[in-house]
Amino acid sequence: MSFMGIEGKGGYHGTVIEEILPVTFANCDDRVECPQGIYFSQKPERHPILNGMPETWPMVLGYNKAFAKPDAEVIVSYDGAPILALGTYKKGRTLAFATDIAPHWCSKEFCEDPCYEVLWKNIVYYLAGELG
C-alpha cells in the first residue's frame, strides 16, 4: 500500500489501518523521492526477517515518510525514517514496509536481485508466525 501518497490521498491517517500498523502517518503527501538512489541501513543485531539479506541492499528510489510508534521494532531505516518496522496487534504480528515492492521506487536492480525473493519470503513467514 502507499501510505498517504500523492496529495495525502491514501487516507490511512487516523484509521484502523494506521491503528494496527507499527507506524503512524502525517496527514499529507508523505512521499520522499530519491531519483539518485538510496541504500538502507539495518540494525547490527539482525532480525530473522533479514536472514539471507546482504548488508547493503540494492538501491531504491524513494520511500513514504512514516513515524515509528513507541512499541515498534525498526529493523531497517533510512535517515532516521522507519523503512521496515514490526509490531503486534491483538494476537497477530504487523509490519510496515515504507517503500515500493514493485518497479517504481523499487529499482529494477532490487526487483531482480535474489535478495528480493528472500526478503518477501521471510516477511510472509514472519507474519504467519513461522519465523522469529
Predicted region positions:
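A glycine-centered loop/beta-turn motif at secondary-structure junctions
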Residues: 1-3, 7-12, 16-17, 65-132
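An acidic, glycine-rich "communication" segment
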Residues: 3-81
